[in-house]
Amino acid sequence: MRPASAARRRAAAIRGRAAQGTRGGVRRTGNRARAALGHLTDRIIDIAPRIPVRDLATLRRQFPGLGPEEIADKLVAGAVAGTATVGAGVGAAAMLPVPPAMPAELAAEITGVAAIELKLIAELHEVYGVRPPGRRAARTAAYLSAWSGERGIDVLKPSTLDSAFGGQLKRRLRQQIMKRVLRDLPHLMPFLVGAAVGAAVNRRDTKKLAARVREDLRKIQVPWDQLEQLPALEKPEKPLPLPETPETDTGDGPRDDGPRDGGPDDDGPRAR
């Protein structure tokens, strides 16, 4: 009996050490994942002020003869095309929900999609005549808040505006990034895995975001003929390169240097 008892004790000790090691590994993995999400949050906050945003006057020059809803449709179409391109490039990598060390491809997708959607949100606020008050830093914080909450900013309610990149905004951003990383890709059919899935999911999510923001902005929309003269938006010192389409061209007016549909004369920057 003694040898058997000793063997049982050794087996129990081994199981205990294995369980302890597993728990420790899970904790270390969780800590690394949280650190990766925190880094992504800071990265998005860092690039947000560099996103080029067209003001209402520029958009009206670029889309002559179109009304607010028609221009908004154009902006959404361009953003959807841009995020689909980002998703198609790294669709397979997005199948890793929360890896111990986040793949560079997945981090690039999240930040790329965020930049395109932040630009969309800012320009939709311009189109609907509800530019958030303040200088670039305050407006950028407001757009980040709108993106993380997937809602429009009500400029008549100061409580909906974040005047600085505080802890509350960072926490909401982390939650939003986590949701994007953990979205329902793992539950899709195996034969759908890959670039097509990344594009389809990003396309769907950007459309959903745009619909929610536009619904909010329509409630507080200011008609163009009732708008006060607004100053031109400040241009970022180091503009972030974004995909160019007829709807997302970052210029100050209509282009006249050739095709605008991605043809051979269109050599603008492309997202990876």
Predicted regions located by residue number:
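Terminal, membrane-proximal amphipathic helices
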Residues: 1-86, 120-272
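Long, highly hydrophobic alpha-helical transmembrane signal-anchor segments
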Residues: 70-119
